[in-house]
């Protein structure tokens, strides 16, 4: 519905869009995230498509607007507040990307990055392709594969400067998903909650088996939110043995570092 206010055409829908874009810009600024002037508008279009597609398929359980902005876009971009985590011009893979977090916001914020978004469900990749088309994104490639299977592809294995995941999985499982994709001398980065402290022992053992070493978790505070995430880098020190990752489903059922089975 379009209304005439003071001789000017006013669309309530346009007003809501402007408020959302302003909220995105405000939250990025409050969190100290570096961004270009066009990023809030790009994130807004992403947000609109996410809401549209979420009505017909399960992409996110978080639907309250302020919470979506913080949990999806801001949380994904908090890695940019720590410059050494994602170097200029890096190749980056987001394993199990789902609706694109954290990899797609990072790609939108950093045109210098070469980003691969990998997921096991084609319908999620169809959504992501719609976002890429709508925004004419040129620095993102989509790959349809499970984490364990993708890491056995010659063109994917140990080819990336950074591998990331925001999946809800124990640290030893994430290590087995991510480290096989990472070049020696580079890193994986896991988005984790405070409960990761209980996973560090097994996580260190798993990382060692996979050629990696855990660094100290980095707290990233999002103002006004009770929940907080930690960013946990894992340095890739040596090549990952050929038997890793194990066959699809095994890392989750029998995590490294928590069992004698390898």
Predicted regions and their residues:
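Short alpha-helix immediately C-terminal to the canonical SAM-binding loop
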Residues: 124-126, 196, 200
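Residue-level signal for inorganic ion chemistry
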Residues: 50, 106, 192, 234
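SAM/dcSAM-binding transferase cores
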Residues: 201-262
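Class I SAM-dependent transferase core
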Residues: 2-5, 9-89, 93, 123-140
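Short loop/edge segments at beta-strand edges and connector loops
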Residues: 37, 63, 144-146, 216-218
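A short SAM/SAH-binding and catalytic strip from SAM-dependent methyltransferases
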Residues: 161-173, 180, 190, 194
């Amino acid at each position: 519905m379009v209304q005439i206010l003071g001789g000017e055409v006013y669309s309530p829908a346009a007003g809501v869009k402007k408020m959302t874009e302003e909220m995105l810009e405000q939250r990025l600024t409050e969190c100290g995230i570096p961004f270009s002037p066009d990023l809030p508008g790009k994130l807004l279009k992403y947000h609109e498509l996410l809401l549209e597609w979420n009505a017909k398929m399960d992409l996110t359980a978080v639907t309250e607007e302020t919470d979506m902005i913080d949990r999806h876009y801001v949380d994904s971009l908090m890695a940019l507040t720590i410059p050494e985590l994602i170097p200029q011009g890096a190749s980056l893979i987001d394993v199990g990307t789902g609706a694109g977090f954290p990899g797609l916001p990072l790609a939108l914020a950093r045109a210098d990055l070469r980003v691969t978004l990998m997921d096991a469900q084609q319908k999620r990749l169809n959504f992501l392709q719609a976002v890429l088309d709508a925004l004419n994104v040129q620095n993102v490639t989509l790959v349809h594969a499970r984490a364990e299977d993708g890491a056995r592809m010659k063109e994917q294995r140990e080819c990336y400067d950074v591998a990331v995941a925001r999946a809800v999985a124990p640290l030893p499982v994430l290590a087995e998903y991510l480290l096989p994709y990472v070049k020696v001398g580079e890193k994986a980065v896991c988005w984790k909650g405070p409960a990761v402290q209980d996973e560090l022992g097994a996580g260190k053992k798993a990382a060692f088996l996979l050629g990696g070493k855990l660094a100290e978790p980095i707290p990233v505070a999002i103002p006004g939110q009770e929940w907080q995430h930690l960013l946990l880098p894992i340095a890739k020190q040596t090549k990952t043995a050929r038997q890793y990752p194990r066959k699809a489903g095994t890392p989750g059922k029998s995590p490294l570092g928590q069992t004698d089975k390898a």
